[in-house]
Swiss-Prot record:
Subunit annotation: Homodimer.
GN (gene name): panC
EC identifiers of the protein: 6.3.2.1
Residues binding beta-alanine, per UniProt: 61
Molecular-function GO term, any one: ATP binding
Protein name: Pantothenate synthetase
Localisation per UniProt entry: Cytoplasm
Residues at the active site: 37 (proton donor)
Pathway stated in the Swiss-Prot or TrEMBL entry: Cofactor biosynthesis; (R)-pantothenate biosynthesis; (R)-pantothenate from (R)-pantoate and beta-alanine: step 1/1
């Protein structure tokens, strides 16, 4: 199994593959790997000659220093999981110094307003951090395809916009959300929940599923009010936002249009641990 820590080494290693026009699939992660991440890797393995996985907790996308401090760092077990899946996967696990070269700061990006909604509204600067690291990693790896999960649907839309605006020659592949047995969306943050919280967090997806049913006959505003009311009586959960948006622009749905696709997004705090999820409303 090959593990690189320096960008110069990974670039040198991948260069002959690029010269031979081999396809390179790329799965960028922040570690604390779960089955959702592994499903992205499987997708890449099936569709590319080589697969690269990066493991890097990116400081510039955390607007809360406490969240960055508490984010799980489990490099050894992450490497074991990847090895069990396929020992030919190339791992790039850089240091902050290697990536940012002494300047740990974000660049500013314009994503045509995608960054102003939901996560962008509640986490100022977050998507500048995401854009900065994704662009840097793409420049290092030069992937043919890059794989992102739909759980972070807004991030997926933003990465697509980043690639389009910067004319990056990488195809972005969105992969379906993997869920636990109780339908809670798989997330590295789930590891910080107690067993009881993890069980009861099934309510998040159940609420989305019910909202989808209601959206068939009710307006977006009525569904949003119902979701807000549902969470008012829940002491364990604090609703940060629930939004029904146009799937393309991520703008809030004011009035339904049968020619558009809509998606519902939710963010909930469980004992200061933020969980997000979304569902297609078609």
């Amino acid at each position: 199994m090959i593990i690189f820590e320096k960008q110069t080494d990974v670039k040198t290693y991948l260069k002959p593959f690029l010269q031979d026009q081999k396809t390179i699939g790329f799965v960028p992660t922040m570690g604390a790997l779960h089955q959702g991440h592994l499903s992205l890797m499987k997708e890449s393995l099936q569709n590319n000659d080589h697969t690269v996985v990066s493991i890097f907790v990116n400081p510039t996308q955390f607007n809360n220093p406490e969240d960055l401090k508490k984010y799980p760092r489990t490099l050894e077990s992450d490497v074991e999981k990847i090895k069990l899946l396929n020992h030919k996967i190339i791992i790039y696990a850089p240091t902050v110094e290697d990536i940012y070269e002494g300047k740990t700061a974000s660049k500013s990006f314009d994503y045509d307003g995608l960054e102003l909604q939901m996560e962008g509204k509640h986490r100022p600067g977050h998507f500048d951090g995401v854009g900065t690291i994704v662009k840097k990693l793409f420049e290092i790896v030069n992937p043919t395809h890059a794989y992102f999960g739909e759980k972070d649907f807004q991030q997926l839309a933003i990465v697509r916009k980043l690639v389009q605006k910067n004319k990056i020659n990488t195809k972005i592949v969105g992969c379906k959300i993997l869920r636990e047995a109780n339908q809670l969306a798989m997330s590295s943050r789930n590891e910080r929940l107690t067993a009881d919280e993890r069980t009861k967090a099934a309510m998040i997806y159940n609420t989305l599923a019910e909202a989808k049913k209601l959206f068939g006959t009710k307006s977006a505003n009525e569904v949003t009010k119902w979701v807000t009311k549902t969470f008012e009586n829940q002491s364990m959960f604090e609703l940060e936002y629930f939004e029904i948006t146009d799937e393309q622009t991520l703008l809030t749905c004011k009035r339904k249009n049968k020619n558009k696709k809509y998606r519902a997004f939710i963010a909930v705090f469980v004992n200061n641990i933020k969980l997000i999820d979304n569902i297609s409303l078609k």
